[in-house]
């Protein structure tokens, strides 16, 4: 059974657009590369043909995985979410107890994660540690160099 993932409407559209690009642009390119390599003669010693077939296999595997993700994707109506605790698509402001640094993140699905824009995956260590927390709670998060404690300062939705 595949895992259900939750997306914003924009995130799901981006995922579908990428899948359509793979099917409509990359798949025909892979077939064309195989055809060109096949036209070069003996297939038993044709490294170009072997490479093109392998690339096509990897592309088909990627398409298959993306189709599964899209099939199990659910769009979240952010206006209906509980703002009293951290959930997927929550914005959360946290404070590191060790150094006092404050950070703001939005928890999103793995495929929407982008640390530069402040979007972290709900499957990341920080994301997992924050899920279900309320304002005033302390999240203890295991990181490679130990445990970090964060205070939840604020939770909101856009």
UniProtKB/Swiss-Prot annotation:
NCBIfam families: greA (TIGR01462), PRK00226.1-2 (NF001261), PRK00226.1-4 (NF001263). GO terms for molecular function: DNA binding; RNA polymerase binding. It comes from Christiangramia forsetii (strain DSM 17595 / CGMCC 1.15422 / KT0803) (Gramella forsetii). Necessary for efficient RNA polymerase transcription elongation past template-encoded arresting sites. The arresting sites in DNA have the property of trapping a certain fraction of elongating RNA polymerases that pass through, resulting in locked ternary complexes. Cleavage of the nascent transcript by cleavage factors such as GreA or GreB allows the resumption of elongation from the new 3'terminus. GreA releases sequences of 2 to 3 nucleotides. It comes from the Bacteria. Residues 24-43 have a biased composition (Basic and acidic residues). One of its GO terms (biological process) is regulation of DNA-templated transcription elongation. Residues 24-47 are annotated as: Disordered. PROSITE patterns: GREAB_2. PANTHER family: TRANSCRIPTION ELONGATION FACTOR GREA. InterPro entries: GreA/GreB_C_sf (IPR036953), TF_GreA/GreB_CS (IPR018151), Tscrpt_elong_fac_GreA (IPR006359), Tscrpt_elong_fac_GreA/B (IPR028624), Tscrpt_elong_fac_GreA/B_C (IPR001437), Tscrpt_elong_fac_GreA/B_fam (IPR023459), Tscrpt_elong_fac_GreA/B_N (IPR022691), Tscrpt_elong_fac_GreA/B_N_sf (IPR036805). The keyword Isomerase does not apply. This is Transcription elongation factor GreA. Residues 48-68 form a coiled coil. Keywords: Coiled coil, DNA-binding, Transcription, Transcription regulation. Belongs to the GreA/GreB family.
């Amino acid at each position: 059974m595949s895992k259900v993932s939750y997306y914003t409407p924009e995130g799901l559209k981006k995922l579908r657009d990428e899948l359509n690009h793979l099917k409509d642009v990359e798949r025909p390119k892979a077939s064309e590369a195989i055809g060109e390599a096949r036209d070069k003669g003996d297939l038993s010693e044709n490294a170009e043909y072997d490479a093109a077939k392998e690339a096509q296999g990897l592309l088909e595997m990627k398409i298959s995985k993306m189709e599964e993700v899209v099939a199990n994707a659910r769009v979240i109506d952010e206006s209906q979410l509980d703002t009293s605790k951290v959930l997927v698509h929550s914005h959360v402001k946290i404070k590191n107890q060790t150094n006092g640094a404050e950070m703001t993140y939005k928890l999103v699905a793995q495929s929407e994660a982008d640390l530069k824009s402040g979007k972290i995956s709900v499957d990341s260590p920080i994301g997992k540690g924050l899920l279900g927390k309320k304002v005033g709670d302390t999240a203890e998060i295991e990181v490679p160099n130990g445990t970090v404690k964060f205070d939840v300062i604020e939770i909101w939705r856009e």
